[in-house]
Amino acid sequence: KMGYWGFFPADEQWGIVPVWGFGTVIASKHPRAQVGEVVYGYFPMGTHLLVNVDKANDVSFFDNHPQRVSSSPVYDNYLRCAQDPSYQEDSQAWLLNYRPLFMTSFVLDDFVGEHISDKVTTVLLTSASSKTAYGCAHLLMKHKAQRGGHYRVVGLTSAANKALTESFGCYDEVLEYKDIEQISRDGESWVLDFAGNKQLLLDLQDLLGEKLSREIFIGATDVKSQTNKPKGKLHGQLFFAPHQVKKRTEEWTREGFNERYAKAWSSFNAHMQDKIQVVEYQGAKAIQDLYQQGLAGTLNNEEINVLTF
């Protein structure tokens, strides 16, 4: 449905899981792809990737392999780490785990800043313990004053994740899902939905009524709720990060976009350094076991993982 099996096609009955990662060029017949250089981008969950280098410049290159079918050019782009202002070799673990998510956090915060009005007093983020959500929350808090905003940044999460989410220090307030009645209705609200739980969204629509001025759908971390399809119409809009990336890249230039992103990333990375532990896994069996934990929803939210074959 989301097109993920098209990135690195396999035989019909199989799918190759795509992951964000770092790769080192070990052989090249293209003058703009140098052996030994490190690049960041979308890779198959494997040891090697053969690319057809296209649109190469000093900052990045694209893969135009004919078998590859991507939903956006963002996924075909490989960034040269030597030219990346946000790259540091000793922070690879953080970039691996957060960069693709924080890129969404970054452009979503930018989108909010572009469209939010001074009538909005509450910005609600569901699945508040998810990386994309609390990355965005950090930026919403950071940019509140310079935007002249009067909003409070409120996270909604499960009872099990409430204390952890509060410890991140990215929200004005964190509420359990069962406590949504405590949400202020004094002014207008935005909902940034990362959970994809339709029943929760319907409950928020009923609770906030006309005070809900915007509802944005970003993700679907609540996998179990996807089988539950309650009746009722949602009134929001889908946020597709690559569209905002493309818009701002055209307006700010690629260099300007990367500089703004690097500044935001530096702020978030410094804020989170003492709150998350890096754990490394090696070998196919360890990777498979961790993948199964992800499917079961049992990953440790206090850890970020680095996987190598």
Segments the model singles out, each with a brief description of its role:
Residues 145-201:
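Adenosine-nucleotide cofactor-binding segment
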Residues 123-127:
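Conserved N-terminal Rossmann-fold NAD(P)-binding element of oxidoreductases
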Residues 139-142:
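Extended repeat-based interaction scaffolds and adjacent low-complexity, acidic/S/T/P-biased segments
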Residues 133-134:
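N-terminal Rossmann-fold NAD(P) dinucleotide-binding loop
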Residues 42-121:
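NAD(P)H dinucleotide-binding glycine-rich loop of Rossmann-like/cofactor-binding domains
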Residues 2-49, 55:
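Glycine-rich beta-strand-centered segment in the early N-terminal region that forms part
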Residues 247-309:
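C-terminal hydrophobic helical "lid"/dimerization subdomain
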Residues 202-270:
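Glycine-rich phosphate-binding loop and adjacent beta-alpha segment
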